[in-house]
UniProtKB/Swiss-Prot annotation:
ATP binds at residues 9-17, 117. This is Argininosuccinate synthase. It is an enzyme of class 6 (ligase). Its EC number is 6.3.4.5. Homotetramer. Belongs to the argininosuccinate synthase family. Type 1 subfamily. Pfam families: Arginosuc_syn_C (PF20979), Arginosuc_synth (PF00764).
Length: 417
């Protein structure tokens, strides 16, 4: 009798390696393993072989860096997405892509189910499950780590008894996830929000204290909100991001220490490193300040905040996310130009910006003799602008009486000696 197939998101680590055998034992599935490289630098050949060695009937490995950068990271950059004002959604952006590829392969292979290696405590289980359901509600979802209720020690014993290799870094106290948009780290000493993260918690960035004494100035060029070159050298977006991770990381840029509100209702202390994301978002925001009309610039952060929340909550494939992204995409039509950024000891400071679509008019802004601003027009504008306040005060009395009591002031007459 032919076994049913399940497609597993496979990382090559202990959890998903054990999951291959567990899915065979528990559900009698034929397991198809799928591993993606979204910029963490996986040895895809090694991962492919390991999946087959631990029992998968087929192993897919996919270099998805460019797809991830273009279809998931770029919309996030154009929206300046920062969950709770700090987290650039590193892991949250990769989950919908992984989900999409797993569903595509499941449909191609005639599989009846998909699986992931998430625990029952984090956000990723929600992101995967909701994405799977949105993309194909007929697929069964299995989460081995969430179901098997094994302790770490029991999991290791299970692996040993089934001939599954134990990773050499298993003793690391940290739980790490990485892609080209950054690196997230939790667990161990990091669970104490009072404790400073030790040096070994970081990998992409140098300690700002130890960063070079001389700043480095780079120029980033954007076309319609998309970064296309660094210092005049054009390159694909995924390569640009990875290169900028190296450039900004050596100056200690992009360290984020954040206590965030997880979707599942708990608070979690996370250490993020996002050198490229931090630099690009700062540059992109400044270019928008130069090119967006005032009303758009004032309203866009409202959309950004909601979009960051929907992505964090695992709602990438929702009508709301699609609608919000449509607004963001429209705002990027004229966000083209070059931004000059100084990288120095943990900071990415924008020190210059230029654009053919700039709404900055020097002749209107200057205070020198070239001033073209119509100062006389200001009088009429001020009168009309303040008219509602004037009418309200005439009807209800001056607002000042309601907030500040009249006080006796000692007045000294100024007498010319």
């Amino acid at each position: 009798m032919t076994k049913e197939k399940i497609v597993l998101a496979y990382s090559g680590g202990l959890d998903t390696s054990v999951a291959v055998k567990w899915l065979q034992d528990k559900y009698n599935y034929d397991v198809i393993a799928v591993a993606l490289d979204v910029g963490e630098g996986k040895d895809l050949d090694f991962v492919k072989k390991k999946a087959l060695d631990v029992g998968a009937i087929k192993s897919y490995v996919i270099d998805a860096k460019n797809l991830f950068a273009e279809e998931y990271v770029l919309p996030a950059l154009q929206a300046n997405l920062l969950y709770e004002g700090k987290y650039p959604l590193i892991s949250a952006l990769s989950r919908p892509l992984i989900s999409k590829i797993l569903v595509d392969i499941a449909e191609e292979e005639g599989a009846v189910a998909v699986a992931h290696g998430c625990t029952g405590k984090g956000n990723d289980q929600v992101r995967f499950d909701v994405s799977f359901t949105a993309l194909n509600p007929n697929l069964k979802i299995v989460a081995p780590v969430r179901e098997w209720a094994m302790s770490r020690e029991e999991e290791i014993e299970y692996a040993k008894s089934h001939g599954i290799p134990i990773p050499i870094n298993l003793d690391s106290p940290y739980s790490i996830d990485q892609n080209l948009w950054g690196r997230s780290n939790e667990c161990g000493i990091l669970e104490d929000p009072w404790a400073e993260a030790p040096k070994d918690a970081y990998d992409l960035t140098i300690d700002p204290v130890d960063a070079p004494e001389d700043p480095e100035v780079i120029q980033i060029t954007f076309k319609k909100g998309k970064p296309v070159s660094i210092d005049g050298k054009e390159m694909p977006l995924d390569e640009l991001i990875l290169q900028l991770n190296t450039i900004a990381g050596k100056h200690g840029v992009g360290r984020i220490d954040h206590v965030e509100n997880r979707l599942v209702g708990i608070k979690s202390r996370e250490i993020y490193e996002a050198p490229a994301a931090t630099t690009l978002i700062a540059a992109h925001q400044e270019l928008e300040a130069l090119t967006l009309p005032r009303e758009v610039a004032e309203f866009k952060p409202t959309i950004e905040q909601k979009l960051a929340q929907t992505v964090y909550y695992g709602l990438w494939y929702s009508p709301l996310t699609e609608a919000l992204q449509s607004f963001i995409e429209k705002t990027q039509e004229h966000v083209s130009g070059t931004v000059k950024v100084k990288l120095y000891k943990g900071h990415a400071q924008v020190i210059g910006r230029e654009s053919e679509n700039s709404l900055y008019d020097f002749d209107l802004a200057t205070y020198n003799k070239a001033d073209a601003f119509d100062h006389d027009a200001a009088l009429g504008f001020i009168k009309l602008w303040g008219l509602p306040t004037q009418v309200h005060s005439a009807v209800n009395g001056p607002q000042g009486k309601k907030s500040i009591e009249k006080v006796d002031l000692e007045v000294k007459e100024a007498v010319k000696p």
